[in-house]
Regions:
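C-terminal interaction module
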Residues: 1-55, 176-282
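Internal, hydrophobic cores of structured domains that mediate oligomerization or house catalytic pockets
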Residues: 48-183
Length: 282
């Protein structure tokens, strides 16, 4: 209708965590990023790090990582770790056309000043802002993976490496690197709304939402796979109490994944299509 692609649907993984200004968290984050690049292939990716994108496998791309990565580890409290990886042309002819990439990794880990900005200066006691890594893979790639590299195994590896506060994974939509067209001025919300009504199995979260201080207290979004850390499970009676509730459910199953209790909502999900009367199971 508007001639622009503002998101692509695919397999999405969202991880939210604290202490983004610590060396331990930065080291875990780089392991996750390395796993993503290994799974996708550096030759398919471009990197955005504070300036115009360049091909990741190019000399400029390698130089950009070699320049910034040491700072994220040597000075984690003072140096933010905020960049994007995405497939497609590093220099598309128009920012507004065909700019939602198939493969995406969005890393937003602030420095100490950014994490505590609101708590120190505007809303004392609100706590730290969250750090997050989110990523997306196209459906065709998911279906092409052999059993030993299926998306469930990849998701489990990523959660085990990152040890998040909480995480979700399943079918969803991932914004383009240029997220401005998701807002009302860019017409992205108007485009998305009917599609999200038609396909009820798609999870949709804006990246800014993942920074919410509300996530200090609870996770407000779930997906087919949800991973909940002990800090949140304690608010619900503890890991074993929650596990017992899940085991009593007809649809849910649970298992330990790293520092989290992983919760699976039924069999591998299809996508309902309301126009064809294909609703999802309750």
């Amino acid at each position: 209708q508007f001639g622009n692609i503002c998101v692509r649907a695919g397999w999405t993984i969202e991880m939210v965590f604290h202490e983004g200004d610590s060396l331990a968290v930065r080291e875990r984050a780089w392991k996750v990023i390395d796993l993503f690049v290994e799974a996708v292939g550096a030759e398919k990716l471009a990197i955005w790090w504070g300036m115009a994108p360049v091909a990741m496998a190019s000399e400029k791309g390698k130089a950009r990582i070699e320049k910034h990565k040491p700072s994220t580890l040597n000075n984690p409290k003072g140096f933010a770790m905020m960049f994007d990886l995405a497939s497609g042309s590093p220099k598309p002819p128009d920012d507004w056309v065909e700019n939602a990439q198939e493969f995406r990794l969005y890393c937003r880990i602030k420095n100490n000043e950014g994490i505590w900005l609101h708590d120190r200066h505007t809303t004392p006691g609100i706590g730290p802002s969250m750090s997050f890594i989110r990523m997306a893979f196209p459906a065709w790639w998911i279906m092409d993976q052999p059993p030993e590299r299926n998306v469930g195994r990849l998701t489990t590896q990523i959660v085990e490496l990152m040890q998040p506060y909480w995480a979700i994974a399943g079918w969803g939509v991932m914004p383009a690197v240029e997220e401005r067209n998701i807002g009302p001025d860019g017409k992205g919300q108007q485009i998305l709304y009917p599609y999200l009504q038609r396909f009820p199995g798609l999870n949709a979260l804006g990246s800014l939402a993942l920074m919410s201080h509300d996530f200090n207290n609870a996770m407000y979004s779930i997906n087919w796979l949800s991973f909940v850390s002990d800090a949140l499970l304690e608010k619900l009676g503890g890991r074993e109490a929650v596990r017992k509730q899940i085991e009593a459910s007809q649809y849910l199953s649970a298992g330990d994944v790293g520092n989290c209790l992983g919760v699976r909502a039924g069999d591998f999900p299809g996508l309902g299509d309301m126009e064809q009367g294909l609703t999802l199971p309750a």
